[in-house]
């Protein structure tokens, strides 16, 4: 055997050694790359070495931190060729493209409902199982999604890590920040198919659509009267309870509705 053949065998042996699967001592899972095993083991240790300098959020992977930083910078490098909408990660773009294609590859075995995202199916299945695996250590409240637990925990800590670059207002959820930023940008991505009116929030569109359908979901337990909005039902309840939470600082008179207080205050202003 000549020297070149020996060298080739040695290289081949090193490649085989590199490809030899590494096993996690905690759960037995195998990985072809040592770096993948190292990242995986952080799940068991709870180790999150990559820290966001903006809000202090911690991550197991550098790539996850890089994606997270786009929340603060507003960077959206992945653009949809169909509608020009841009996204912070490639995975979110792929999921978004299914809106255009109508593809829903993830189907629930219980009820047949289909989803364009695997996490959406997993979350949905907990409706059938009633599973709530994420529990708050402060108050014991349990949640079906980890993100819901994270948001809830901020109610205990008062943490508001998502800050508006325009006005400095802070929020405990990234979704709330995104909705708020539309005040500055004027963006209204949710459009009514009936009349074309546009809204900054999907919930506002849903409420508006009830003006066309006549649907009234919120029913008074006292008199059976129905309302399109929860806020309108809450105001109506005050007729039965006698509650008048809006008080005039000028004369002490109280009102059920903020609008009634404003009208009253104009009387003082005209004195």
From Swiss-Prot:
<dbReference type="GO" id="GO:0000978">
    <property type="term" value="F:RNA polymerase II cis-regulatory region sequence-specific DNA binding"/>
</dbReference>
<keyword id="KW-0677">Repeat</keyword>
<comment type="function">
    <text>May be involved in transcriptional regulation. Essential for Golgi structural integrity.</text>
</comment>
<comment type="similarity">
    <text>Belongs to the krueppel C2H2-type zinc-finger protein family.</text>
</comment>
<dbReference type="Pfam" id="PF00096">
    <property type="entry name" value="zf-C2H2"/>
</dbReference>
<dbReference type="GO" id="GO:0005634">
    <property type="term" value="C:nucleus"/>
</dbReference>
<dbReference type="GO" id="GO:0003700">
    <property type="term" value="F:DNA-binding transcription factor activity"/>
</dbReference>
<keyword id="KW-0539">Nucleus</keyword>
<feature type="zinc finger region" description="C2H2-type 8">
    <location>
        <begin position="218"/>
        <end position="240"/>
    </location>
</feature>
<keyword id="KW-0479">Metal-binding</keyword>
<feature type="zinc finger region" description="C2H2-type 6">
    <location>
        <begin position="162"/>
        <end position="184"/>
    </location>
</feature>
<feature type="zinc finger region" description="C2H2-type 9">
    <location>
        <begin position="246"/>
        <end position="268"/>
    </location>
</feature>
<feature type="zinc finger region" description="C2H2-type 5">
    <location>
        <begin position="134"/>
        <end position="156"/>
    </location>
</feature>
<keyword id="KW-0238">DNA-binding</keyword>
<feature type="zinc finger region" description="C2H2-type 1">
    <location>
        <begin position="22"/>
        <end position="44"/>
    </location>
</feature>
<feature type="zinc finger region" description="C2H2-type 2">
    <location>
        <begin position="50"/>
        <end position="72"/>
    </location>
</feature>
<dbReference type="GO" id="GO:0008270">
    <property type="term" value="F:zinc ion binding"/>
</dbReference>
<dbReference type="GO" id="GO:0005730">
    <property type="term" value="C:nucleolus"/>
</dbReference>
<dbReference type="GO" id="GO:1990837">
    <property type="term" value="F:sequence-specific double-stranded DNA binding"/>
</dbReference>
<keyword id="KW-0805">Transcription regulation</keyword>
<feature type="zinc finger region" description="C2H2-type 3">
    <location>
        <begin position="78"/>
        <end position="100"/>
    </location>
</feature>
<feature type="zinc finger region" description="C2H2-type 4">
    <location>
        <begin position="106"/>
        <end position="128"/>
    </location>
</feature>
<dbReference type="InterPro" id="IPR013087">
    <property type="entry name" value="Znf_C2H2_type"/>
</dbReference>
<protein>
    <recommendedName>
        <fullName>Zinc finger protein 501</fullName>
    </recommendedName>
</protein>
<keyword id="KW-0862">Zinc</keyword>
<keyword id="KW-0863">Zinc-finger</keyword>
<feature type="zinc finger region" description="C2H2-type 7">
    <location>
        <begin position="190"/>
        <end position="212"/>
    </location>
</feature>
<dbReference type="GO" id="GO:0007030">
    <property type="term" value="P:Golgi organization"/>
</dbReference>
<keyword id="KW-0804">Transcription</keyword>
<dbReference type="GO" id="GO:0006357">
    <property type="term" value="P:regulation of transcription by RNA polymerase II"/>
</dbReference>
<dbReference type="InterPro" id="IPR036236">
    <property type="entry name" value="Znf_C2H2_sf"/>
</dbReference>
């Amino acid at each position: 055997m000549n020297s070149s053949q020996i060298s080739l065998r040695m290289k081949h042996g090193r490649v085989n050694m590199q490809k030899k699967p590494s096993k996690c001592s905690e759960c037995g899972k195998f990985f072809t790359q040592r770096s993948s095993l190292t990242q995986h083991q952080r799940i068991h240790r709870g180790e999150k070495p990559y820290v966001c300098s903006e809000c202090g959020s911690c991550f197991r992977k550098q790539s996850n931190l890089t994606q997270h930083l786009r929340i603060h910078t507003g960077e959206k490098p992945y653009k949809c060729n169909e509608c020009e909408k841009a996204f912070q990660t490639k995975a979110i773009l792929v999921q978004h493209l299914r809106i255009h294609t109508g593809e829903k590859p993830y189907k629930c075995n219980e009820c047949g409902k289909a989803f364009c995202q695997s996490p959406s199916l997993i979350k949905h299945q907990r409706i059938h199982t009633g599973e709530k695996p994420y529990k708050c250590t402060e108050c014991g409240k349990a949640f079906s999604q980890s993100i819901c637990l994270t948001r809830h925990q901020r109610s205990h800590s008062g943490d508001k890590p998502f800050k508006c670059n325009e006005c400095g207002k802070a929020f405990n959820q990234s979704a709330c920040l995104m909705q708020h930023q539309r005040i500055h940008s004027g963006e209204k991505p949710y459009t009514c198919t009936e009349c074309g009116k546009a809204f900054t929030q999907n919930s506002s569109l849903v409420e508006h659509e009830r003006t066309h359908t006549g649907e009234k979901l919120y029913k008074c337990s006292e008199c059976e009267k129905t309302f399109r909005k929860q806020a309108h039902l809450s105001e109506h309840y005050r007729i039965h309870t006698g509650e008048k939470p809006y008080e005039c600082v000028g004369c002490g008179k109280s009102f059920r509705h903020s609008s009634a207080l404003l009208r009253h205050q104009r009387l003082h202003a005209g004195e």
